[in-house]
Amino acid sequence: MEGKTVISSLLIMSLVLAQIQVEAKICCPTKDDRSVYFVCMLSVSSQFYCLLKSKCKNTSQTICPPGYTNDILENSGDAVNEYCKLGCASSVCGALTTLQNFDTSKVLSEAVEQCTKACSSVCTGGSTAAVKSA
């Protein structure tokens, strides 16, 4: 039980810290490259590697450079929903997922599952329920 309390505390702290991070804009040449970037960030969590693998670029500008029209933060409803679910899981749950690669304990697996459920709940409007379940 003590382990679950620690994991839950880390999860809540990660959710809070993720809210205060400054987001850079990731620009990709195609939607497929954008998807490759998202999947890579979920599994590897090394932005440098994922940018190379996906051919995407990290920029601090408000507009993507020519040829990189598929930005991660575009305002279409589908993109926002996709970014929310995948971006939240990669940025907030990334550390837990990395730990899970080295430690396959049930407590850690449950923490990763709770984290991804919390992200999904936040993205679909149930942020209060997500915080309560964590």
From Swiss-Prot:
Keywords, comma-separated and alphabetical: Disulfide bond, Plant defense, Secreted, Signal, Toxin
Q: Please tell me where this protein is predominantly located.
A: secreted
The GO biological-process annotations, alphabetized, read as: defense response
Pfam families, sorted? Thionin
Where is it located?
Secreted
Give me the residues of the propeptide, which is removed upon maturation: 71-134
Q: Name one GO cellular component term.
A: extracellular region
The cross-references to PANTHER family, in alphabetical order and at most eight, read: THIONIN-2.1-RELATED
Main role? Answer: Thionins are small plant proteins which are toxic to animal cells. They seem to exert their toxic effect at the level of the cell membrane. Their precise function is not known.
Annotated protein name in UniProt: Thionin-2.2
